[in-house]
Amino acid sequence: VACRGSKSDSVTPNSVMVRRETTHGSASIPPVVVGGIMIFLQREGRTIRELSYSFEADGYIAPDLTILAEHLTLSNSITEWAYQQSPDSVIWMVRDDGLLIGLTYQREHEVVGFHKHVTEGKFRSVCTIPGPTQEELWTVVEREVDGITRKYIELMDNRFTGDSSEHAFFVDSGLTYDQEESDSVFTGLDHLEGKTVSVLADGAVRPDVVVRNGSITLAAPAKIVHAGLSYISNMKTLRLEGGSLNGGTAQGRKKRISHVTVRLFQSL
């Protein structure tokens, strides 16, 4: 929909012009604009497309982005999404089964990458708001705690950029305790009653403990403690392509990996 005339002209039935730019219908979820490109969800809620101008076609095109990760929306649809501009330009999406999907999108650098996030519960809603150092991602998570299903409003912690493991927060629905005196009993975990939580105390990993009466007890006292639900981070590489002795591809051939070199970025 476009309006003819200058910015100061009034909107009238004669000044409004409707022009179809793509044949792909959109869902009821409002689109997001990233770097001048509009990202919208197709009518069935399973295909994400970008609407951008093509000089070759001399018009707008809407290529499919989910073709890079069709399995993420093959059987489930997107019910809600929100765009987090900083620090990494990510579109966060909630799937109808409670899974959280992220789309890292930086078209100027040709970066389009999907990633999924699983928690001990189900994501139901997501939104972003401005924060002091970056945009904050807030979610509504449905968890079953002590036999009762509850909905929690949770904030995704800022990306860890420190050089000390004492402030590394890598748990779900967790709390941080930072006090002057060491202690071994920490309260305030009523929202995780009966759950087994992971603990990082003064930069060291402690054995998992169970929340009882809203508190946990550590074997040794500590000052800075992070406690919450644990999660596992998995990375799956592409198939190794080592070439062939006779030329061509090595796909389908037997391989034996004898050495692996792992390069880490800003590891502790």
Go through the PLM ranges and name each one.
Residues 2, 8-27, 33-37, 42-268:
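Beta-sheet repeat architectures centered on beta-propellers
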